[in-house]
Swiss-Prot record:
Belongs to the universal ribosomal protein uL18 family. It comes from the Bacteria. It comes from Pseudomonas entomophila (strain L48). Gene3D superfamilies: 3.30.420.100. This is Large ribosomal subunit protein uL18. This is one of the proteins that bind and probably mediate the attachment of the 5S RNA into the large ribosomal subunit, where it forms part of the central protuberance. Keywords: Ribonucleoprotein, Ribosomal protein, RNA-binding, rRNA-binding. Part of the 50S ribosomal subunit; part of the 5S rRNA/L5/L18/L25 subcomplex. Contacts the 5S and 23S rRNAs.
Amino acid sequence: MTDKKVTRLRRARKARLKMHELEAVRLCVFRSSQHIYAQVISADGSKVLASASTLDKELRDGATGNIDAATKVGKLVAERAKAAGVSQVAFDRSGFKYHGRVKALADAAREGGLEF
């Protein structure tokens, strides 16, 4: 693995350990060059309560690797999380910088009713 990826994974591991100690439901984000994925994971980490990505049928037809797509994913995951009875989450950015697509997804999820 490249040094950049190793350091990102190390940052992610430290953040997830802290969230595990707090026993918080977490909104986990992963981004690739073409898509973005979001999952709401239970406090013990054993169950995915809600998920959304640019691979979903509703979002697949449009552009998938930009800020607009990340905003749509954020709104969709917030809607699905609220339907599952989750309103408060810890934001797990998976070691990515809080900037660009990751920030757009987080802002849209907040607008959709999730509290961080």
